[in-house]
Amino acid sequence: PKTICTSINEVVCHGIPNTRPLKAGDIVNVDITTIVNGWYGDQSETFLIEPVSKSAKKLVQVTFDALYVGINASRRGGTVADIGRAIQSFATKAGYSVVREYQGHGIGRDFHQEPGVPHYPVLASNRDLLKSGTCFTIEPMLNIGSWKTRVDTKDKWTVRTIDGALSAQFEHTILMTDTGPEILTATKNGPQEGHKF
C-alpha cells in the first residue's frame, strides 16, 4: 500500500510506513522496489538506531552475513536449494531461526516470478537450476525467537514474529552470469561483504 516497506523491531516484513517516531534501540528494515526501463529491482537493508542492545546488533550482523553466505553459495549450474542450505546452516549455528513463510524470488519484467528462493532447505528447490541469465533475490529474514510469523489482523499486511522477538532482513537482486553471481543492487556507499555493524 506504500512505495516502501519499513519494518521495525519485531516486524519481519511488509511494515507500512507511519508517523511512529523512531527511538534509540530500534532496528529498522527499509525495503525498496524500483522499476528501470521496465525491469524490476528489489533491495532491503536493516538500520540500527543507536544505541542498540548487543543482541540486536548481533542479529543484524548475522543476518547481513547470511545474505552473503547465500550469494556465495549461488553458482551457475547450482540449484536454489544450495542457497537455502547455506543460509539455514549459517543462521542455525549462530542461534537464529530462518523465516519460512516468506522467501526470495525470481525478478525481471515481473516483480515476482520463478524461481522461488527459500532461505532454508526445500527438497523441491533442488530442481531449480541457476542458469546464466537467471535474475532473483536473496533476502534472508532471521529471528531471535521462533521462525513463525503472523499477519497483523488490522491492516492485513504487516508481518510480525509470532513471539514478539526481533527480526532483521537484508536483500539484494542477483543476476547469474557465466562467471557467477552479480549483485545488481550494490551501491558505492552501502555496506559491502565483510562490513561490521
Name the predicted role of every residue range:
Residues P1-F197:
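Active-site neighborhoods and metal-handling regions in enzymes and metal-associated proteins
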